[in-house]
Design a protein with these regions (language model features):
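Active-site-adjacent structural segments surrounding the nucleophilic cysteine of cysteine proteases
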Residues: 4-7, 14-140, 192
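Generic hydrophobic secondary-structure signal
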Residues: 10, 80-84, 96, 138, ...
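Structural recognition of the beta-strand scaffold that forms the well-ordered cores
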Residues: 74-76, 154-156, 175-180
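Residue-level marker of positions within ordered structural domains that often coincide
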Residues: 80, 147, 183
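Short secondary-structure junctions and interdomain/linker hinges
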Residues: 103, 149, 176-177
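Mid-length scaffold segments of soluble, non-membrane domains
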Residues: 125-164, 168-172
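Active-site-adjacent substructure of cysteine-protease-like catalytic cores
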Residues: 160-213
Length: 214
């Protein structure tokens, strides 16, 4: 395992992070007084409070794991497996998908299809007919795995984190798991839908969501 690293970062546009404390510090009130309340001076003081500037580019040696052919719909498990392997764990993508990340099959009735909220569990079967899961479910799966390995690392969902938070994590040697779209195209809703087990509300999934590691 990589020495000196206490947390793993998983992230999405929904986002997940192994560790916390990545928010930039707010600008101290004294900084405004010292600069005469000028915007340029306050901005300069705020940037200085963030620490050293981030590099333009960072290349991390993340292991490559292919989701195909076993899991055509298993990008979340594949991305998490790559992240765990980066930290020195002998993670297997099929085990991560079926033993650790929460998963729930669909139930079919005469009138409706019922399924999980992707925030809480993977919807369907990643090897067959499945959709996706979101950051909370992936973080839960990661923490199940880490606990079983007696690791001090923990995954934290940081959905909504801004670009600076993600870039700083990568610059510190911590890759992130993010949700994007296939080809980075605009989000598209699927024609398929189901009712949630939790409250019977109708859920319309995205058609082109994709999970990857950055």
């Amino acid at each position: 395992m990589r020495a000196g690293i206490k947390s793993i970062l998983l992230i999405l546009a929904c986002a997940v992070l192994f560790g916390a404390g990545f928010r930039p510090r707010p600008l101290p009130a004294a900084a405004y007084a010292a600069t005469g309340y000028s915007f340029a001076g306050a901005l300069r003081a705020w940037k200085e409070s963030l620490g050293p500037p981030l590099p333009e580019a960072v290349l991390l040696d993340v292991p490559v794991v292919y989701q195909w052919p076993e899991m055509p719909n298993g990008c979340e498990a594949t991305a998490l497996t790559m992240l765990l392997q980066y930290y020195g764990f002998a993670a297997d993508k099929l085990s991560v998908a079926y033993d650790y990340i929460p998963r729930s099959d669909f139930t079919y009735t005469w009138f409706s299809t019922y399924g999980p909220d992707p925030a809480s569990a993977y919807a369907g079967d990643p090897a067959l007919f499945g959709f996706y899961c979101l950051a909370p479910a992936v973080a839960e799966g990661a923490n199940r795995y880490l606990a079983e390995q007696d690791s001090t690392l923990r995954a934290v969902d940081i959905s909504g984190a801004d670009g600076y938070v993600l870039r700083r994590s990568i610059a510190q040697g911590r890759p992130v798991v993010v949700w994007a779209t296939i080809g980075f195209e605009p989000l598209v809703y699927s024609d398929y839908s189901w009712r949630l087990y939790s409250d019977s509300s109708v859920y319309h999934p995205y058609k082109n969501l994709h999970c990857l590691i950055r």
